[in-house]
Amino acid sequence: MLRLALTGVTGRMGRAVLELAASAPDIQLVCGLIRPARDPHEVAAQLPAPLALTSRVAELVQGADVVVDFSHPAVTVAVAEAAAHAGIPLVSGTTGLSEHDQAVILRAAQHVPVVQAANFSLGIALLHWLLPELVARLPTWDVELIERHHRHKRDAPSGTALALARTLLAAREPAPSPLVYGRGPGTAPRQPGEVGIHAVRAGGEVGRHTVLLATDDEAIEVTHWVQSRRAYAQGALEAARRLIGRPPGLYSLQDLVT
C-alpha cells in the first residue's frame, strides 16, 4: 500500500488527486497540507474524501511514502526541503518557480528521487518524445506553439508550453534563435530556427497545446487537449507509484513512462 501525503488540497489539482487517490485500491491517504489560517474542520468538510490535515510541513511527511505537491512555489520549496530531510520521494507539479526555488528542488533531488513536471498528462509526456522526431525530420519548417487555458490561470505562457518549447529548441540544429513570445506591433520578421509561443486565456478551457509546423506549401498541427483534470491526477499518481525505489535524482514524467 502506497502511503501518500498531499499539498494544495483545496486547489483544483489537489482536489482531483485526492478524489482519485481515495478510490485507488493501492493508495492510502495519510495527510494533507493546508494554510495555517484555515480551520482544518471546515476544510475537511469541503473535501471530496476524508483526509487528516495539518498546517505543518514536518507533520505532512511523517508516515508517508511519497508526497504529491500541487501548491505554490513557497510551499513547494518548504515541502522539498522536508521531503529531502525525511528521505521521502517527491512528485511536484507546481509551476512558476524562480531560479532560487528550482535550486532548492535540485538540492532535494541529491537526496531523494524527485519527479517534476509542468504537466502530468501521459499524453504530454509522449508529445515530448514525438516532437523531436518531427523537428529533426523537418529542420527547415517554421514552428509555432499555441497554448489555451481558462481565464483564471495566472502564469503565461504555461509551464507546459515552456517545457514543450524547450524540447523543440533542443531538437533544432544548428543552434536556434531564442523563443519569441507573441507577435505584436513592431515585431521583426520571423527568423530561421526560432520558435514562437502564444498564450490564450478564455473561458473554462482546462488545457490545450498545439504545435504548428509549416512551410509555404503545407502544414502539420499536433494538438493535445485535456478534457478533465483527472488526466493530470492520473499521471501524478502513476508517477508516484513509479518513483518508489528509484535512486535520488531529478526525473521528468517522460523518464518514468517512455
From Swiss-Prot:
This is 4-hydroxy-tetrahydrodipicolinate reductase. GO terms for cellular component: cytoplasm. The keyword NADP applies. It comes from the Bacteria. GO terms for biological process: diaminopimelate biosynthetic process; lysine biosynthetic process via diaminopimelate. Belongs to the DapB family. NAD(+) binds at residues 8-13, 93-95, 117-120.
